[in-house]
């Protein structure tokens, strides 16, 4: 029997994935395609399947295995991701999925904001727009505002990566 599996992050499926189709399968038992594509339903179901099956969790290989990993060059936590981030992350995702399909132990580790300078600048500009400055509000209040900004946009960025279908090991964020 010829089997074609939709690649969902791991080829270690053994044909048991609900998205595996067999040439000799009974087509009467197959779900009919909808007339229109409903991305929110489809993408949520697939994203949940990936999470439930641990499709993107890094699995340590033996000491003789050659591992492949990428740490996302962290986007600054200055705002939501833009098209340039999507392109960059897509290229990384292609490399990770290729190596995963080739049987390499893989890890694509997400992260955000490597230095904080850009985030500090954005928060300072916001304070200026509000008619104050970091010096006027004091160090503790400024650190608190910067932390709140970081927490808000870090969540947005991680949620965007998940929505894009990035095959990161999100348990490592």
Show which residues each predicted segment covers.
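Compositionally biased, low-structure terminal segments
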Residues: 6-8, 22
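Short hydrophobic targeting helices and cationic amphipathic motifs
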Residues: 8-11, 17
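N-terminal, positively charged nucleic-acid-binding surface of large information/translation enzymes
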Residues: 21, 26-173
């Amino acid at each position: 029997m010829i089997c074609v599996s939709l690649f969902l992050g791991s080829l270690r499926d053994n044909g048991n994935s609900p998205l595996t189709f067999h040439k000799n399968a009974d087509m009467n038992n197959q779900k009919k395609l909808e007339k229109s594509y409903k991305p929110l339903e489809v993408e949520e179901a697939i994203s949940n399947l990936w999470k439930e099956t641990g499709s993107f969790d890094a699995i340590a290989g033996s000491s003789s295995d050659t591992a492949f990993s990428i740490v996302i060059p962290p986007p600054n936590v200055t705002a939501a991701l833009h098209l340039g981030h999507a392109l960059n992350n897509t290229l990384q995702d292609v490399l990770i999925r290729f190596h995963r399909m080739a049987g390499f132990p893989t890890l694509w580790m997400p992260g955000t904001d490597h230095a904080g300078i850009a985030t500090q600048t954005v928060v300072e500009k916001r304070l200026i727009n509000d008619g104050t400055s970091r010096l006027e509000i004091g160090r503790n209040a400024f650190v608190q505002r910067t932390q709140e900004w970081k927490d808000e946009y870090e969540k947005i960025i991680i949620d965007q990566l998940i929505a894009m279908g990035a095959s990161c090991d999100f348990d490592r964020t």
